[in-house]
Amino acid sequence: CPGLNAVIRGVTNSLIKTVGARVTGIERGFMGMIERRSRPLDSEAVAGILNQGGTILGTHNFANPFSCNGVDVSDKVMEYVRELGLDALVAIGGDGTMSIANRFTPLGLPVVGVPKTIDNDLMHTERTFGFDSAVAIVAEALARLETTAR
């Protein structure tokens, strides 16, 4: 997931420097909100992550607090949000992530969405990060196949 650590680092450092915010990273996305898994992030915690692959917080693509095994656990997630003292949620992901994140706004949790998808299918975005990476990998694979086919 190229770019995720860059976003985490940028958001963390910007919030600390501009407003003196206390930043909390939720591990494994919405699953971490359900499982109550988080960690504090500061400039030191994100200092060397730009060149690391993946993401320091981990990812999870299938968790939905509004339908966790058919049960809406969003009230428990919001209780955890209040315990952590979160003022906002920065969600990094594609259309699924954004549609889930958007449902927290009426519950009192402002959301900032960072578009990340290889599909490049999010409204109001020209190009999402993840898309260029996918195109580059496909182009490289096609070039290798062409060489092999000769």
Where are these regions (language model features)?
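General beta-strand structural signal in soluble alpha/beta enzymes
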Residues: 23-27, 57-59, 88-92, 112-114
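Glycine-rich oxoanion-binding loops at beta->alpha junctions
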Residues: 33-91, 127-143
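Short Gly/Thr/Asp-enriched flexible loops that form oxyanion-binding sites at enzyme active sites
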Residues: 6-11, 96-109
